[in-house]
UniProtKB/Swiss-Prot annotation:
Active site: 20, 38
Catalytic activity field: an acyl phosphate + H2O = a carboxylate + phosphate + H(+)
InterPro entries given in the database record: Acylphosphatase, Acylphosphatase-like_dom, Acylphosphatase-like_dom_sf, Acylphosphatase_CS
MF annotations from Gene Ontology: acylphosphatase activity
EC number, UniProt record: 3.6.1.7
Family note: Belongs to the acylphosphatase family.
Enzyme class: hydrolase
Protein's name according to its UniProt entry: Acylphosphatase
Record's keyword terms, sorted: Hydrolase
Pfam families recorded: Acylphosphatase
Domain Acylphosphatase-like: 5-91
Lineage: Archaea, Methanobacteriati, Methanobacteriota, Thermococci, Thermococcales
Length: 91
């Protein structure tokens, strides 16, 4: 298993429901690096970097999110890894 990088856009009721904090907790649990932030259009953007199976697991989590979230769509773009360290919330 190699290191991969996924760029996500998550749509639905994903702001004001603890999505970023919950994603950070899940990422740390899985050992995935990257970042997450809210966007002005109401969506959430995230970059996930780590072992493929762990990144895939976090993408799977993103389709549900925390209990108060209502995810309607997740767009995933695969990119070249850039060496992210840790997982942070931006903004």
């Amino acid at each position: 298993m190699g290191i991969v990088r996924a760029h996500l856009r998550i749509y639905g009721r994903v702001q004001g429901v603890g999505f970023r904090w919950s994603m950070q907790r899940e990422a740390k649990k899985l050992g995935v690096n990257g970042w997450v932030r809210n966007l002005p259009d109401g969506s959430v953007e995230a970059v996930l970097e780590g072992e493929e199976e762990r990144v895939e697991a976090l993408i799977g989590w993103a389709h549900q999110g925390p209990p108060l979230a209502r995810v309607t769509r997740v767009e995933v773009t695969w990119e070249e890894p850039k060496g992210e360290k840790g997982f942070r919330i931006i903004g």
